[in-house]
A protein has these predicted regions:
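Active-site clefts of carbohydrate-active enzymes
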Residues: 2-26
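Active-site region of glycoside hydrolase catalytic domains
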Residues: 2, 37-46
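Carbohydrate-interacting/catalytic domains
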Residues: 28-30, 44, 49, 53-226
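Conserved interdomain hinge at the start of the Helicase C-terminal
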Residues: 33-34
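Generic alpha-helical structural context detector
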Residues: 7-10, 38-41, 89, 93
Length: 226
């Protein structure tokens, strides 16, 4: 499916761009935009980035002109140093360098705040977690959509690919350097240690393997198993 469907955050047919710049605090939602771009490039599909996103265009309104802002009128209007441009550049490089992000199978992952009860994020704003797996390579993406509170918890990973104490390398964070991100190592969960709630309403037990992750508000991380 990922080879045939184009995915996007916004386009010229929508009434407003995905990125919102509040008049009173223009950069309040910058991290949400870079988080969304990272998810766009990591999820299944062919990512399509609407022009101007990388330059922070944020028009809204009922007329077509509201989301078709002119980018080329001023001299040197395209800023290669813009933080959004740099984030897109980094995420695109990660996608290009990781075949699992282009061709891998996709699995949404249950999460836990206490290390015992796991399930899909049931609160808003929540935490999005998924894996892309190709052969023996697993990429884990975790996004904390809460703009105010951080998140510390665990994400289930593939049991067969992740022996206890497996470590993950941080390929991307939209908020800080890779060295500052707290992640792993993988923990073993015996059958009597976990309760896994599935999207269809079913409940199962372990054994399972879980990856500890700590995220800042509006932070997304892309991780690769070593």
């Amino acid at each position: 499916i990922g080879r045939y469907f184009v995915t996007f955050l916004d386009n010229h047919d929508q009434g407003q761009r995905f990125y919102y710049s509040a008049p009173a605090n223009p950069h309040a939602y910058d991290d949400q935009l870079t988080m969304a771009v990272a998810c766009l490039f990591a999820l299944q599909g062919i990512p399509c980035l609407y022009y101007g996103t990388e330059q922070g265009l944020h028009g809204s309104g009922n007329s077509p002109e509201a989301v078709r802002e002119a980018l080329w009128g001023a001299p040197n209007a395209f800023d290669r140093g813009h933080p959004f441009y740099q984030a897109v550049r980094q995420v695109a490089a990660v996608r290009a360098g990781q075949p699992a992000l282009r061709y891998g199978r996709q699995y949404f992952r249950p999460i836990s705040g206490n290390g015992a009860q796991f399930g899909m994020s049931a609160f808003t704003p929540g935490v999005l977690a998924f894996s892309r797996i190709l052969d023996d390579a697993e990429i884990v993406v975790v996004a904390n959509t809460d703009p105010q509170a951080g998140w510390q918890g665990q994400v289930l990973v593939d049991l067969a690919l992740n022996p206890p104490m497996t470590t993950y390398r941080v390929l991307f964070s939209n908020r800080r350097s890779a060295a500052d991100v707290q992640v792993g190592p993988v923990q073993h969960k015996a059958a009597d240690m976990v309760e896994i709630h599935h999207a269809d309403g079913g409940v199962s037990a372990g054994p399972a393997r879980a990856l500890p992750v700590t995220l800042w508000p509006s932070e997304v991380v892309i991780l690769r198993r070593l």
